[in-house]
């Protein structure tokens, strides 16, 4: 629980461990379980990491997704060879164009999770304030260690497994 300890030492009021049944689910179910727990304990804000966007951006993406909700299941049936995110992206491009908030929200895992949080939050009885925290440094899946930027988890795991870039790895781990 070292991450929980660091969070508490740096001003977090409480740290809630997600049940395994929630944390091992697909994005939409993970988001649903997370939002339900946070709303039940009375949280008024939902903060999460993302590549870009603010609360208004995610609200717009949710609105666009709601506008095509009825078409999603039909489109998914017709395009079974694609992942759900790819299917939803194609449908969003068709309906709103490539520059829409929904299309942008589907471009990376963190954006997809942020969208899923926002969708579930909007369904709740007492929606929380959405507080996206923009990622600083390397992208979510970047696998190279870089002295000039915070490393991604992917890069740290790769370096630890391969015992490479020890100096840079030590510098990156000093942030943790």
What does each of the following model-derived ranges do?
Residues 9-20:
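A glycine-rich helix N-cap at a beta->alpha junction
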């Amino acid at each position: 629980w070292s991450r929980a300890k660091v969070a508490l030492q740096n001003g977090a009021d409480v740290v809630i461990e997600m049940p395994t049944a929630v944390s091992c689910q697909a994005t939409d179910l993970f988001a649903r379980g997370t939002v339900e727990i946070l709303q039940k304990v009375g949280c008024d804000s939902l903060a999460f990491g993302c590549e870009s966007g603010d609360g208004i951006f995610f609200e717009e993406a949710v609105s666009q997704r709601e506008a095509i909700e009825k078409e999603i299941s039909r489109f998914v049936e017709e395009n079974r060879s694609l992942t759900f995110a790819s299917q939803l992206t194609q449908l969003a491009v068709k309906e709103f164009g490539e520059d829409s908030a929904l299309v942008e929200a589907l471009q990376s895992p963190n954006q997809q999770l942020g969208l899923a949080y926002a969708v579930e939050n909007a369904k709740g009885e007492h929606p929380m304030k959405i507080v996206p925290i923009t990622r600083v440094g390397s992208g979510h899946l970047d696998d190279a260690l870089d002295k000039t930027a915070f490393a991604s988890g992917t890069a740290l795991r790769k370096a630890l497994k391969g015992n490479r870039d020890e100096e840079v790895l030590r510098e990156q781990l000093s942030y943790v």
